[in-house]
Amino acid sequence: MKPNIEIHHIPGIERLEDVEFVKVMTEHTSPEKVHNVNWAEYSYAPDVAVNLAFSDNVLALMYTVKEEHILGTVLEDNGPVWEDSCVETFIKDPFSDNYYNFEVNCIATKLAAHRRSRTDCDLFPTEKLNEIRCFSSLPHEKTNTINTDQKEWLVALMIPFRLLGLESAPDFLDVNFYKCGDNCRQPHYLSWSPIGLPEPNFHCPEFFGRINLIKK
């Protein structure tokens, strides 16, 4: 069954300092598990959750991850971040059958695009990418934690509604949240909303769930 949840308004959350943002999101939102293993041959399942909120201007997300191998090699935006320890936010275009994907590796390197399909997209230029606030608990440098005690990381993302073509917060968004790591020691492909396809593929809006933005 597709998830259908409510998320709540936190005025001005995008203006908080990083530490305060994490505190507010932890204390005032509930974690949504990104835990669906849709393909048996990729059975490894890190512990992944996303906390969600919104302001008048942005959708705010905080991913927390615990995994055996943390890999961060991509330093340039719009590079192949999905090969690293990566979380992904896919949002259906409110005005068409297209969708947006916002992908971030564990060291806060971003990829964003407006997509018609898995292979047909318009990548966000630098000026648009710079509108997306993003930070990580890890430094922005290459990391590979095989055989170390480092197992956990956090990344936050604030996506302005204007990048979705919206003037203000909508009543709802159709979305999916993912965790992947193509080049990790144990490749994996987890989703928030289940995916009923025979092979790993996140580019499937027909399986998106829904978040309802409660403006009380």
Report residues per predicted region.
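Structural preference for beta-rich elements and adjacent junctions enriched in aromatics
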Residues: M1-K216
